[in-house]
Amino acid sequence: MVGAKNAVFPKEEISRQYAGYYLNKIWKLGSYLGYGNYFKKKIAPPLTDDHTYINKLAQIPTLDIIHYNISSITNRYDFGKFHHTHQDNLEIIHKPTLKATGQTVLTYLYNM
């Protein structure tokens, strides 16, 4: 989902609550690097995912960079038609999206 074509990464609420400082820095950096079309300033509802428990139980600030957008079909947030299906495989990896996320995270890590 971090490498799907036309991915959109909003600021997910659990990430904002527990790792907001890092989330804002990474999203700002993504925009600065020219990837604002991926790293959106919009807020998304909370997700229960691995980062939820790492934040709550281990108390390690962790954020989720995940394609999470409003579906034009259901008008609700979803992960795309490929999520948890046989279509969720390497064939849907979009190199420009993967470059945007990878370059943004690596630039942040090497410059923190």
Stretches found by the model and what they are:
Residues 2-112:
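Active-site-adjacent substrate-binding region
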